[in-house]
Regions:
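Conserved catalytic cores of phosphodiester-cleaving nucleases, focusing on short active-site segments
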Residues: 91-93, 105-118, 136
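Active-site-adjacent loop/helix micro-motif of nuclease/hydrolase catalytic cores
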Residues: 116-129, 155-156
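Charged, low-complexity C-terminal accessory regions
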Residues: 179-267
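Nucleic-acid nuclease catalytic cores
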Residues: 125, 134-218
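Phosphate/oxyanion-binding active-site loops and adjacent basic polyanion-contact surfaces
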Residues: 29-37, 84-88, 125
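Charged, often low-complexity linker/regulatory segments
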Residues: 1-64, 229-267
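Active-site metal-binding core of divalent-cation-utilizing nuclease and nuclease-like domains
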Residues: 56-107
Length: 267
């Protein structure tokens, strides 16, 4: 099933250095879900890696003039008036290509923040987000996923591991040159792998995409997420897709346009 509609209107493009969101510093300091969620979608590289995990071949085949329109933290009934559970949609993501909304590939994500500590790495989350994801499936959204965004403290340096640093010599051939060995805190990888394993083990519906992403704070860099592709929801209808489009048309200025490729610079 493929269903597209004209984009008609487009949010303003946010360039390097532009203000995207204003976030209350109190929410940032306490690592609130909204603050972390907004910071996550502003990290376009990390967001793109997660989107690729959840949408698989579709992402790989997206063309030069394509991208995603992201709306965070929406009251559910504003999109589907009769919808009551879950009460909100953490991320609504509508892909586009050549000024066409690809509504049949729209993705909604249920976000959970996982606050880990070195001394409690084995602790399971209180909630996985699957009940909310099931509600999103029952409401007819075409693709649904649960994302665990992981934050943590740092491991003691005595637990850091030896890793190799490599330099890319030839990007086309993939040739690299090993430079040196350094000590690195590899706990983020362990947390993602463990978290993803729990998601897979507890997931009640194969249609639900799964994503475990480490959100590095300060200068820890980006870590590639663990994920499983979402599958098309057979409860989706054209009526639901039209409601998603109508919501976009009425609120397009509040969506974040994240392109797959940087814009082509004109001479």
């Amino acid at each position: 099933m493929e269903y597209k509609l004209p984009m008609k209107v487009k949010p303003p493009v946010k360039k390097d250095g532009d203000i995207i969101f204003h976030i209350d510093v109190k929410l940032v300091n306490k690592a609130d879900e909204i603050a972390l969620g907004l910071q996550y979608i502003c990290n376009r590289y990390l967001y793109g890696q997660g989107y690729r995990k959840l949408m698989g071949d579709f992402f790989d085949k997206m063309g030069l003039h394509s991208g995603t329109l992201i709306k965070p933290f929406i009251i559910s009934s504003h999109v589907i008036p009769q919808m009551s559970f879950p009460g909100d949609i953490d991320f609504l993501i509508i892909p586009y290509e050549n000024d066409q909304l690809i509504l049949s590939k729209a993705l909604v994500i249920e976000l959970k923040i996982i606050r880990a500590k070195f001394i409690k790495q084995q602790k399971s989350p209180n909630e996985y987000g699957f009940s909310q994801a099931k509600g999103l499936i029952e409401s007819g959204f075409p693709y649904v996923a649960v994302m665990h965004l992981i934050i943590s403290d740092e491991s003691p340096q005595s637990h850091w591991r030896d890793v190799l640093i490599a330099k890319v010599v030839d990007a086309k051939s993939g040739k690299i040159e090993l430079i040196e060995t350094i000590k690195k805190d590899m706990m983020p990888i362990s947390l993602m792998e463990r978290g993803f394993g729990r998601l897979v083990h507890n997931c009640p519906d194969e249609r639900i995409g799964l994503l475990a992403t480490y959100f590095a704070q300060e200068k820890a860099g980006n870590w590639l997420p663990c994920g499983k592709e979402a599958k098309f929801n057979d409860k989706c209808t054209v009526g639901i897709l039209d409601k998603i489009a109508e919501y976009y048309y009425q609120n397009y200025t509040t969506f974040l346009d994240t392109r797959k490729y940087p814009p082509i610079k004109k001479d």
